[in-house]
Amino acid sequence: MRDKIKLVSSAGTGHYYTTTKNKRTTPEKLEKKKYDPVVRKHVLYKEAKIK
């Protein structure tokens, strides 16, 4: 089953993306470089739980 996760910006802006991931095939935390419109740069986004 695919679980919903939140990708939070490491720039500290509070911006985030939501996506899904298959926890059985990728049990480790997801890290991805994506665009942060607040700082207008590509920064590292790290996985966090959706509350």
UniProtKB/Swiss-Prot annotation:
Cited Gene3D superfamilies: Ribosomal protein L33 (2.20.28.120)
Keyword Metal-binding carried by entry: no
Keyword Ribosomal protein carried by entry: yes
One MF annotation (Gene Ontology) recorded for this entry: structural constituent of ribosome
GO biological process: one example: translation
Entry GO terms, CC: cytosolic large ribosomal subunit
Entry keywords, A to Z: Ribonucleoprotein, Ribosomal protein
PROSITE patterns membership: RIBOSOMAL_L33
Pfam families: Ribosomal_L33
Stored HAMAP family: Ribosomal_bL33
Similarity comment text for this entry: Belongs to the bacterial ribosomal protein bL33 family.
Protein name as catalogued: Large ribosomal subunit protein bL33
